[in-house]
UniProtKB/Swiss-Prot annotation:
Gene Ontology terms, MF aspect: small ribosomal subunit rRNA binding; structural constituent of ribosome
PROSITE patterns, A to Z: RIBOSOMAL_S18 (PS00057)
GO CC field: cytosolic small ribosomal subunit
Protein's organism: Marinobacter nauticus (strain ATCC 700491 / DSM 11845 / VT8) (Marinobacter aquaeolei)
Disulfide bonds, paired cysteine numbers: none
NCBIfam families: S18 (TIGR00165)
The protein's name in its UniProt record: Small ribosomal subunit protein bS18
SUPFAM superfamilies reported for this sequence: Ribosomal protein S18 (SSF46911)
Domain of life: Bacteria
InterPro entries listed in its UniProt record: Ribosomal_bS18, Ribosomal_bS18_CS, Ribosomal_bS18_sf
Family membership: Belongs to the bacterial ribosomal protein bS18 family.
Stated role: Binds as a heterodimer with protein bS6 to the central domain of the 16S rRNA, where it helps stabilize the platform of the 30S subunit.
Pfam families (UniProt xref): Ribosomal_S18 (PF01084)
Regions annotated as coiled coil: none
Amino acid sequence: MARFFRRRKFCRFTAEGVKEIDYKDLDTLKGYITETGKIVPSRITGTKARYQRQLATAIKRARYLALLPYTDGHDH
């Protein structure tokens, strides 16, 4: 039986020594939302709980300021 080794998940923010996640850093935030606009959970990304909370707040602020979409385009 073949064994599959999953890559070890690690927190990018801890590795880079980030203190605060900025809502204006759209390139980083876009990596943590799905194509439908949902926030990707930390069990998938490997982000630590502290940074996941900051990430969620930053994404919500960016959405409120229309920097990020709430959902996808819905083009049928």
